[in-house]
C-alpha cells in the first residue's frame, strides 16, 4: 500500500499514548511503514560521550511510529483527514483533502 504521508506534513496521532498530539513529519520510512513525527513518541537514549563531537548523557529523541496511527491535518480546514489523489489541469498529480476538497500539496 502506498504511503500518503510526506516529509513536512502536519499530522495528528489518532491512537496510543500520544493520541491527539500534532507534529511535523521529520522522516518517512516506507519499508517499515513508519514515520518519525516531531515531539511524538519520545524515548530516552543513553549516549556515550565523544570528546571532539558531543557530550554524553541521557538524551530524549523521537522514535518511529506506525503510519496507520497518524492522519494528515488539512492546512485549509485544520481538521485531520484522509488524503486522495487527483490530477490538476496541467496534468500534475496532487494530494487533496477529502473533507473540504482543498489541495494539500502547495509546491
UniProtKB/Swiss-Prot annotation:
**Source organism's superkingdom?**
Bacteria
GO CC terms of this entry:
ribonucleoprotein complex; ribosome
Which Pfam family, giving just one, matches this sequence?
ribosomal_L24
Give a GO molecular function annotation for the protein: rRNA binding
- InterPro entries the record matches: KOW, Rib_uL2_dom2, Ribosomal_uL24, Ribosomal_uL24_CS, Ribosomal_uL24_KOW, Translation_prot_SH3-like_sf
This protein's record includes keyword Disulfide bond: no
Family designation: Belongs to the universal ribosomal protein uL24 family.
Record note on quaternary structure: Part of the 50S ribosomal subunit.
Q: What is this protein called?
A: Large ribosomal subunit protein uL24
Cite the source lineage.
Answer: Bacteria, Thermotogati, Thermotogota, Thermotogae, Thermotogales
Which gene holds the coding sequence for this protein? rplX
Amino acid at each position: 500500500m502506498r504511503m500518503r504521508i510526506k516529509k513536512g506534513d502536519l499530522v495528528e496521532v489518532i491512537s496510543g499514548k500520544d493520541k491527539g498530539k500534532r507534529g511535523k513529519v521529520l522522516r518517512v520510512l516506507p519499508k517499515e511503514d513508519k514515520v518519525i513525527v516531531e515531539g511524538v513518541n519520545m524515548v530516552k537514549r543513553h549516549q556515550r560521550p565523544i570528546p571532539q563531537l558531543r557530550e554524553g548523557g541521557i538524551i530524549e529523541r523521537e522514535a518511529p511510529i506506525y503510519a496507520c496511527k497518524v492522519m494528515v491535518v488539512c492546512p485549509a480546514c485544520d481538521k485531520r483527514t484522509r488524503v486522495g489523489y487527483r490530477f490538476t489541469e496541467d496534468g500534475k498529480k496532487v494530494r487533496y483533502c477529502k473533507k473540504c476538497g482543498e489541495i494539500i500539496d502547495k509546491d
